[in-house]
């Protein structure tokens, strides 16, 4: 990869409207802020629409033993198994793990990370 092949997009992900697909969708701490079922389904639908076949979805969320809130906002916590279940229809699970993240404030937060490969467009 080079910097000419990277696209940074700043928008409300649930209102994403593009005319192209991506090879890599990297979400480090957005998905866990999406807490209602309809919005979770919309996010998954957008991943399916905008990640090209064979593309990668890399997602990091608070783990099951992570915080209940972040910056005063409600969040949803996930395990590797939870994420596998949510994305199983159109994405092949590649790997998943938990990681303890040290914050600038000297605390630690538990995260779940997963990597998936897009297998179909349904």
Specify the residue positions occupied by each region the protein language model found.
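Short catalytic micro-motifs in class I SAM-dependent methyltransferases
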Residues: 29-33
